[in-house]
UniProtKB/Swiss-Prot annotation:
Phylogenetic placement of the source organism: Eukaryota, Fungi, Dikarya, Ascomycota, Saccharomycotina
Family to which the UniProt record says this protein belongs: Belongs to the RCF1 family.
Membrane disposition: Multi-pass membrane protein
Primary site of residence: mitochondrion
Protein name: Respiratory supercomplex factor 1, mitochondrial
Keywords of this entry: Coiled coil, Membrane, Mitochondrion, Transmembrane, Transmembrane helix
Coiled-coil region: 88-158
Species assigned in the record: Kluyveromyces lactis (strain ATCC 8585 / CBS 2359 / DSM 70799 / NBRC 1267 / NRRL Y-1140 / WM37)
Length: 158
């Protein structure tokens, strides 16, 4: 039986082997709002620091408030993304289970097809062997008849 490639391996095995940058990109694709919230929070902190440095306390306070709101948004995005990703993972696992069953069914059908073809080949070989035997018998019978014909011709000559 040939090796069937596994198309339903989990990503967890591959995730451990990924380099850091690839892991980061993978997770950012899984939960795109979290990096956006983090960048927005960082921007708010930077603007608040710049306003503090310039002496504009009122704008600095506004940007610090934005920082808190954006951190809250990031946290909510993180929790919501984890929940959504968890439900999608369960759906994917059930889908993967269906794919496994389908692959197993295809494998069984392929095995049955191979067995059917093997039986057909055996039947053809048996028929060919019978035909060879029959041809051999016919050849022997033909040689006997030719011998009888020669004998009869010799008798007629005498």
């Amino acid at each position: 039986m040939s090796y069937l490639p596994s198309s339903f391996d989990s990503d967890a095995d591959d995730l451990d082997e990924m380099p850091f940058l690839d892991k980061m990109i993978y997770h950012c694709k899984q939960q795109p709002l979290v990096p956006l919230g983090t960048l927005a929070t960082t921007g708010a902190v930077l603007l608040a620091v710049l306003n503090v440095k310039n002496g504009n306390k009122r704008k600095a306070q506004i940007w610090f408030r934005w920082r808190v709101a954006l951190q809250g948004f990031t946290l909510i995005a993180l929790v919501a993304g984890s929940y959504i990703y968890g439900t999608n993972k369960n759906e994917r696992e059930s889908h993967e289970e269906q794919l496994r069953k389908k692959a197993k069914m295809r494998e069984q059908l392929w095995i049955q097809e191979l067995e059917r073809r093997d039986e057909e080949t055996k039947l053809r070989r048996q028929k060919a062997e019978l035909a060879r035997q029959k041809a051999k018998e016919m050849e022997q019978e033909t040689s006997k008849l030719q011998q009888e014909l020669k004998d009869l011709e010799e008798r007629l000559k005498k």
